[in-house]
């Protein structure tokens, strides 16, 4: 039986992104939150009545990506864990919404920032403010933060399931994986 990968998101851009050549075979379908809600409504599915899956393996770092500042926090905490004595600390700066992203790019080009890691969220509030959200972005941010706070692990480096997966793939450490894997590299062509 063939497995499928269905991505759900409040983001319309994910539909196009899933068709990009270098990842086209990774995702079968992309549904917006609104489309998932419509399917649930038509099928009479009430997620709030379903039992929760107690097998949560995600870290706080992975859970908070959906809101502005989440990517920055995740990267900063993970880098600090990989190399606590790093001579150059991660100094993040975020831009929230397309106009703010454009201004941030201008500031970077003019050398008007001390940051060395930049997070630009096209949607105000991050993904929680995407065009196909089904709750208000403020509530989405609160839920994302609460979900992050419930995580058993702060970063993937603490997660035994991630470490076991890396070992199965032939990597003896996260550092070895980062040095020798191209899994985090995207090819956007020329």
Question: What kind of feature is each model-predicted range?
Answer:
Residues 2-6:
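Short, small-residue-biased leader/transition segments that mark boundaries at the very start
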Residues 11:
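Phosphate/adenylate-binding glycine loop and adjacent helical scaffold
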Residues 7, 15-17:
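Proline/glycine-rich low-complexity loops and linkers
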Residues 1, 14:
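Mid-sequence acidic-hydrophobic segments that form the walls
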Residues 19, 24-190:
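Iron-sulfur (Fe-S) cluster-binding modules
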């Amino acid at each position: 039986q063939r497995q499928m990968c269905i991505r759900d998101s409040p983001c319309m851009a994910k539909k196009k992104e899933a068709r990009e050549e270098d990842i086209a075979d990774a995702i079968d379908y992309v549904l917006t939150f609104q489309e998932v809600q419509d399917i649930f409504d038509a099928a009479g599915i009430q997620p709030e009545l379903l039992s929760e899956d107690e097998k949560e393996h995600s870290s706080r770092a992975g859970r908070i990506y959906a809101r502005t500042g989440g990517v920055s926090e995740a990267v900063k905490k993970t880098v600090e864990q990989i190399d606590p004595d790093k001579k150059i600390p991660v100094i993040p700066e975020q831009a929230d919404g397309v106009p703010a992203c454009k201004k941030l790019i201008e500031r970077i080009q003019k050398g008007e920032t001390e940051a060395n890691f930049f997070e630009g969220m096209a949607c105000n509030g991050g993904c929680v403010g995407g065009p196909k959200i089904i709750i208000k972005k403020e509530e989405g941010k609160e839920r994302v933060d609460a979900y992050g706070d419930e995580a058993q692990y702060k970063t993937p480096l603490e997660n035994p399931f991630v470490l076991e997966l890396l070992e199965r793939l032939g990597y003896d450490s996260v550092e070895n994986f980062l040095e020798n894997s191209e899994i985090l590299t995207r090819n956007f062509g020329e």
